[in-house]
Regions:
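Alpha-helical transmembrane segments and their immediate juxtamembrane cytosolic regions
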Residues: 1-318
Length: 318
């Protein structure tokens, strides 16, 4: 019996990444809050994208590979189209699509291979970016590590939900997920503390957009905690969190709307306002809930899915 590919908790986590980006882009934040949040919403978005690639690639074939490549290319094109209206926002879709293409072959690998590539990407990113003193907007090597990290979190938190597993295997997976979450809590506590330490070694910086070991490990740890919590809440209170899950199912659509509305708002009304950010979040939650209930798939998601099926029909490349 096939398991459902739509996981409520994963959709909630995806919506929290979008909400986090809205807050960072639009809200008037205290310096300390900026330090805490810097880079985490976008890295969470990337890590969840890596986990989503694993869901797409469960029955991996050459068709899957071609469709992931095509998906990445389409995301890049959408990102490029948004660049002229990005305004104060550094559009994340270009790097998202590029990394998706670069790691499109990895869902076919085993967990240990992906772990090895995660370590390699993290080391390469640290070697490259540690000497740099200025923040990197979206450092490519670190983003490759984020996507692979998301694939590893799929193995820990999601695989058993999508595959028929025995009771003993489910118990093992459950224990592993709690162990990973517990370790992630410790890493997050340490990382958040040292985000405020300017004297820390360059390779160990935990601050956002540095692309080094500290930030990468912290970002994956935060994503693990968020994902585990969202899965817990989504399993037990799906009705209460429906608006967030709905937003998560159409995150591309909401992100596009966010960039477009933020460009107008910040050019013509207010550059940064916490009230405005809250208003847009509520607006997008309502819009997503209504669209999901009465229409279904988000318009951008439907457009991308239709284009992918047209470009790479089922069975192509086998």
């Amino acid at each position: 019996m096939n398991k459902p590919s739509r996981i409520v908790g994963l959709d909630i986590a995806r919506s929290l990444a979008i909400i986090g980006m809205i807050i960072v882009h639009m809200a008037s934040l205290l310096w300390s809050t900026k330090v805490v949040l810097s880079g985490l919403p976008s890295s969470l978005f990337a890590i969840i994208a890596g986990a989503t690639m694993m869901i797409i690639g469960r029955n991996y074939s050459s068709t899957t590979f071609l469709r992931l490549i095509t998906r990445g290319a389409l995301i890049i094109l959408i990102g490029l189209a948004l660049l002229p209206v990005g305004g104060e926002i550094q559009v994340v879709l270009v790097i998202m699509g590029l990394v998706m293409m670069l790691v499109s072959w990895m869902p076919a690998l085993g967990t240990w291979w992906r772990l090895g590539f995660f370590v390699a990407a993290t080391l390469a990113a640290t070697i490259k970016y540690a000497p740099m003193t200025l923040p990197q907007i979206y450092p490519l090597l670190a983003w490759i590590a984020y996507f692979i990290g998301g694939m590893l979190l799929y193995d820990v938190y999601l695989r058993s939900r999508l595959q028929g597993t025995s009771t003993s295997e489910n118990g093992t997976n459950s224990r592993l997920s709690w162990i990973v979450t517990a370790v992630s809590v410790v890493i997050t506590a340490v990382g958040m503390y040292f985000r405020f330490d300017p004297e820390i070694a360059g390779w160990l910086r935990f601050t956002g957009h540095t692309g080094v070991f500290g930030e990468i490990i912290l970002s994956v740890a935060v994503a693990a905690i968020v994902l585990h919590l969202c899965l817990f809440v989504g399993d037990r209170f799906p009705t209460a969190v429906y608006p967030f899950a709905a937003m998560g199912t159409m995150s591309l659509t909401i992100y596009i709307l966010h960039v477009l509305t933020a460009f107008y708002w910040q050019q013509n009304v207010l550059l940064h306002s916490t009230l405005s950010a809250a208003g847009f979040i509520v607006f997008f939650l309502v819009i997503a809930s209504l669209w999901k209930k009465f229409v279904g798939q988000g318009p951008a998601e439907k457009l991308v899915a239709t284009a992918i099926k047209a470009i790479v029909p089922s069975g192509k490349g086998k």
